[in-house]
Amino acid sequence: MAKWTKFPHDNSGFQYTAATLKKNWARLHRGDCEPFPKDDAVVQAWIAFHAGDFEKAATLGLAAGPDGHNAANKAICIYANYLEKSDKKKLELYQEVGERCEALQAADKKNANAFYLYAYAMGRYSQGISVTKALAQGLGGKVKEALTIALKLQPKHADACIALGAFHAEVIDKRSEER
């Protein structure tokens, strides 16, 4: 993996131990409804994520196997969206997350965040190649379906609800530009 840009802000308020992460988990994951991990290695990945150490979170999450993939995928998506400077690298990262999410969906059909993070990654990928091109490749339907499944699995998944609304708004906006 190429060198990652470090999180540029003070993160001292987000330094957690396993115990303090568990205590704050519901507040930190209100939007994505991610369940608190059972595996200590995955807990460490989430500790790194919340501290803004996205590279470490990705590395630890991937090393933990499928149980750590939501932490890794979220870390990679947030990193790509906010810190990665290369558009080409962003697209590569989003594609990698999308592929990993598809495998995770097949292995665990009840993992709402495997569907949500797929939609996030492919939605951002679509924006990078242009929404019109993405729709032509069928990504629009796949993103919408993934968000719909995430919401069926976890109706209180606020992030998926917001993303589905944004998806509809962007598709309508792009379609109206074409006319």
Language-model region placement:
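Conserved alpha-helical positions within TPR/SEL1-like repeat arrays
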Residues: 116-117, 162-163
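Short, structured loop/turn "capping" segments at alpha-beta junctions
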Residues: 156-161, 175
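N-terminal alpha-helical interaction modules that lie
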Residues: 1-115, 121-128, 132-154
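Conserved small/polar residues in nucleotide/adenosyl-binding loops
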Residues: 178-179
